From Swiss-Prot:
Transmembrane residue ranges: none
UniProt key word Ribosomal protein: no
Classification via SUPFAM superfamilies: Plasmid maintenance system epsilon/zeta, antidote epsilon subunit
Organism whose genome encodes this protein: Lactococcus lactis subsp. lactis (Streptococcus lactis)
Keywords: Plasmid, Toxin-antitoxin system
GO biological process: negative regulation of cell killing; response to toxic substance
Complex and partners: In the presence of the zeta toxin, forms an inactive PezA(2)PezT(2) heterotetramer.
Gene Ontology terms for molecular function: toxic substance binding
Family: Belongs to the epsilon antitoxin family.
Keyword Chloroplast on entry: no
Pfam family, one: Epsilon_antitox
This protein's name: Antitoxin epsilon
Summary of the function given for this chain in its UniProt record: Antitoxin component of a type II toxin-antitoxin (TA) system. Neutralizes the toxic effect of cognate zeta toxin. Part of a postsegregational killing (PSK) system involved in the killing of plasmid-free cells. Continuous synthesis of the epsilon antitoxin is required to counteract the zeta toxin.
Length: 87
């Protein structure tokens, strides 16, 4: 099995980034005492989506797919930032 250091690096970055977003959403849901099983709640839906995304085997994706996935996570982070912002 050949090592692809660029792909491995991208996977590590994605894993850390995804974990940070998940932690932010989990803290928000817990701090606001939201029901994690409430499918009508936007914040809990995003938390559940992030939890499900942790199950994806990133090593099966191509570098191009990883880069697209990373961009998707950037969009999710912007969205998570906007819905967890306190005034």
């Amino acid at each position: 099995m050949a090592l692809d250091y660029r792909k491995t690096f991208e996977i590590e970055i994605i894993n850390e980034f995804q974990s940070a977003i998940h932690s932010k959403m989990l803290n928000y849901v817990l701090n606001n005492e939201l029901d994690k099983s409430d499918s009508t709640n936007l914040q809990t839906n995003l938390l559940n989506q992030l939890s499900n995304m942790n199950q994806i085997n990133l090593f099966k994706l191509s570098l191009e797919e990883l880069e697209a996935y990373h961009e998707y996570l950037r969009s999710i982070k912007k969205y998570a930032d906007s819905i967890t912002r306190t005034t």
